[in-house]
Amino acid sequence: MVQLGLVIAQFDKSGSLIAEMAEAAREAAAGREATVVEEVAVPGAYDTPLAADRLARRSDVDAVAVVGAVVEGDTDHDQVIADAAAQGLTDVSLDRDTPVTLGITGPGMSRDEAGARVGYGARAVESAIDLAENLG
């Protein structure tokens, strides 16, 4: 059975979007009989690499799934945040030799578009489980 770490980027002023993504991630894990051994909530997507690294260091974590959303604002800030998070998570995965999957939606999307993509939480978990099983 695969044991997962789950990182949840909380930057969602209404709260429901991220809560739905996290719940989709938990349901996907349960559906595959994987165990989420720890969840770490962080303020935003930019903060996810550090939390993913802490989880990837643990001997009881086979893979880490990261969920969150980067919604478009009035500047290019969303692009900068999304790029930094994606690169940071890739670095963690390679440095720790542990699957770290990206379930952060965006950038360049509206709140409505983000809401339509809550299933990415489940996709991140599915990918994490597949990688942990295939790379064993």
Which residue ranges define each predicted feature?
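C-terminal binding/interaction regions
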Residues: 37, 78, 86-136
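Generic structural signal for well-ordered alpha-helical scaffold segments
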Residues: 26, 53-56, 90, 129
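Glycine-rich phosphate/diphosphate-binding loop of Rossmann-like nucleotide-binding domains
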Residues: 2-41
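Glycine-rich phosphate-binding loop
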Residues: 47, 51-88
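Haloarchaeal acidic low-complexity proteome signature biased toward cell-envelope/secretome components but also
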Residues: 1-3, 134-135
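Conserved active-site and cofactor/substrate-binding residues in soluble primary-metabolism enzymes
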Residues: 16, 20, 24, 43-47, ...
